[in-house]
Amino acid sequence: MITIGITGGIGSGKSVVSRILLTLGIPVYDSDSRAKWLNDHSPVVRQALTGLIGSDLYENGILRRDRLAAAIFSSGDLLEQVNGIIHPEVKKDFCQWRSECESDLCAIESAILFSSGFNSLCDTVIRVDAPEKIRQERAMARDGSSAETMRQRMLSQEREQSLAKAGADHTVLNAPPHLLVPQVVRIIETVRTKRPNPPDRL
């Protein structure tokens, strides 16, 4: 099975590309939503996070994300430790999901594909891009955030975006006059064409 990574900055249109792949019959793993699910339901994650931060991090069995964010904000090195807990569990969850896929291709969508190391699970990576102004406008309309809040979020992603720009195999442009669907379809055709032939059976 060939694994495709999908990444891009906020407002770039990663989820749109994921939906295109789904319409092409390619299953897509949403690492963000699965990470949130694991934060709430994985005993491994819960035990490690409460051991690191405190038992009041969970309320009625659900992670209080505001408390986690406050703890990370108050401690410079805590984010790396939290990621060290969550990312390995997401990788395990993805590998289990992939093993159950009945398809020649599958994909994983992640805004932090490279900094998390998820790119090591991929055979090829698609980076979704758009001009910064368009990305900001899209994200503000979607999230209802202020321009300053969105600017800070985009600044926080600069390192990841540099890694993605250097490491991605394909880039699609999700802004006029570029049409997104034909770009994605061409990449999938290329990936399928270049896949290695199975060995001859004796």
Curated annotation (Swiss-Prot):
Gene3D superfamilies: P-loop containing nucleotide triphosphate hydrolases (3.40.50.300). The keyword Cytoplasm applies. Signal peptide: none annotated. Its EC number is 2.7.1.24. Residues 138-161 are annotated as: Disordered. ATP binds at G11, S12, G13, K14, S15, V16. This is Dephospho-CoA kinase. Catalyzes the phosphorylation of the 3'-hydroxyl group of dephosphocoenzyme A to form coenzyme A. It comes from Porphyromonas gingivalis (strain ATCC BAA-308 / W83). The lineage of its organism: Bacteria, Pseudomonadati, Bacteroidota, Bacteroidia, Bacteroidales.
